[in-house]
A protein has these predicted regions:
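A short beta-strand motif characteristic of beta-propeller blades
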Residues: 1-5
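Beta-rich catalytic cores
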Residues: 10
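Residue-level detector of Asp-centered blade-edge/turn motifs that repeat once per structural unit
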Residues: 16-19
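Short loop/turn segments immediately following the C-termini of beta-strands
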Residues: 28
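Short loop/turn segments immediately following beta-strands, especially the blade-tip
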Residues: 37-46
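Membrane translocator/pore-forming domains, dominated by Gram-negative outer-membrane beta-barrels
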Residues: 47-91, 95, 99, 133-460
């Protein structure tokens, strides 16, 4: 700290530069007016640098990254779990025809995965090409909108959470009634921290492999394994100054569940147990925008381990050319994830700090209600509303709408991903008439970029 008593007899005013790295002291000694200038090691740090761990918005911003990483595992696995539950609710559906699906990525890691893991994973069926029941593909998609809030505490500000995502998947049934598939998720999380403008904007891309396997007549095991890539934009606003940061991350996650269905008169009761697990790594980053106040964050590892028990209830109604199937979900979850910590320092002075025991472990209740609509034409619909409520009062509301479509033998689909841009192509041949439809979407563009193209032609 600075002691100016030996240099100024009558201090009448103190001022700081805009970045807080310079302090000016006005001394009135008799008629001699003197202004002294002092260089500070960090912004506005006259005695000591401002301790970020004592600022509720700073603490909340750090907690938000840990919470968002754990929520990402839930938001990525829920659509796949919904799909596996849908498959078992409708396991009597026969495959209509064979389809051809291709996956292309410009990312070298994902492209390598698609060329090595996908063929091995999706061809391990020992099924005959002449057996349509065991060789047809099904495409599905699910869009999710989620809103939530985590209240303030004695050390942390409140957080308002908005999440939107789309999941695209493909699966097929094997000879032993085993369903295997893959899913791609594109998501965006926006979290507002406190009341001064601090925020986290997180964009994610996830690739999931999943399998649902029978263990008898009515007992099934579901498991999935996946990888997500994370890019975050962070704003830390104190009201008078604001800093910005960019952070990348990777996440490995998995889930295993066991379900046993009890049926009577088209009414199904399915108790289940489930374990979710995962590890997230966030890279180090340095804030910009306020010299003297910018913080430098070390890399961080976040563990996730959640167990849950619950049940599903559904009942089938057979209507003309369609089936209507309403259902209800209930789950009780115990979060036993280990605590994590974040180390950081002022980039100007190097003063170091650590936020320990970042632990969002809690107990929560998950409820959901929705319905399936299954038509003979090949188009099927699933809608679902869910709510996650913790014992501490935080919550998440989700609305889900998903589609499934199976087309004719002469139909082909192609899905390609180029950085954040996605392209879906559909081609169909009817006698000598060919129909090509291509749609592209950049999910994370500031100004959404999208297009759809239709081509109809004949070959003779």
């Amino acid at each position: 700290g600075y002691d100016v008593s030996g240099e100024a007899d009558q201090v009448s005013g103190i001022a700081f530069s805009s970045d807080g790295l310079k302090m000016f002291v006005l001394d009135f000694k008799t008629n001699n007016k003197t202004v002294s200038e002092y260089n500070l090691s960090c912004g506005f740090g006259v005695i000591n640098c401002i301790d970020p761990t004592a600022n509720k918005d700073d603490v909340a911003s750090i907690e938000t990254q840990s919470e968002s990483a754990k929520k990402l595992i839930q938001h990525t696995t829920y659509p796949v779990i919904n799909r596996m539950q849908w498959l078992r609710r409708n396991n009597s559906r026969g495959n209509l025809t064979n389809q051809n699906i291709k996956f292309q990525f410009n990312n070298e890691i994902l492209n390598s995965l698609s060329k090595t893991l996908l063929p091995v994973y999706l061809s391990n069926y020992n099924s005959s090409n002449t057996d349509n029941e065991n060789s047809s593909w099904s495409l599905w998609s699910e869009g999710t909108i989620s809103v939530g809030r985590i209240g303030d505490t004695s050390v942390s500000s409140s957080k308002d959470i908005n999440t939107s995502a789309i999941t695209l998947g493909a699966d097929k049934r094997g000879k032993d009634n085993i369903m295997r598939g893959i899913a791609l998720r594109f998501g965006s999380d926006d979290v507002d921290v406190g009341d001064l403008g601090s925020a986290l904007n997180m964009s994610t891309f996830g690739l999931t492999f999943y399998e649902t396997k029978p263990k008898g007549e009515e007992r099934f095991t579901d498991h999935l394994l996946g990888l997500s890539f994370i890019n975050s934009d962070l704003i830390n606003n104190s009201g008078s100054t604001s800093t910005n940061g960019k952070r990348s991350g990777e996440q490995i996650y998995g889930s295993f569940s066991l379900r046993d269905t009890l049926s009577k008169n088209n009414l199904n009761f399915t108790p289940k147990i489930k374990i979710d697990y995962g590890v997230t790594h966030f890279a180090e980053y340095t804030e910009t925008g306020a010299t003297g106040l910018n913080l430098k964050f070390k890399d961080q590892y976040i563990g996730n381990f959640i167990t849950s028990v619950g049940a599903n209830i559904d009942k089938k109604f057979d209507l003309k050319n369609k089936t209507f199937l309403p259902y209800f979900d209930f789950n009780y979850s115990a979060d036993m994830s280990p605590s994590t910590k974040q180390k950081f320092s002022y980039s100007s002075s190097g003063d170091k700090y650590t936020l320990d025991n970042i632990n969002n472990a809690t107990h929560s209740v998950h409820t959901g209600i929705g319905f399936d609509l299954i038509t003979d034409s090949g188009f099927n619909l699933m809608t679902k509303y869910t709510r996650d409520q913790t014992t501490e009062g935080s919550y998440n509301d989700n609305f889900v709408i998903a589609g499934d479509y199976r087309a004719s033998y002469n139909s082909t689909y192609a899905l390609s991903v180029h950085e954040t841009s996605t392209e879906i192509a559909y081609k169909s041949k009817h006698n000598n008439l060919n129909v090509d439809v291509t749609s592209n979407l950049d999910f994370f563009a500031d100004d959404p970029e999208y297009g759809i193209y239709l081509k109809v032609y004949s070959l003779k």
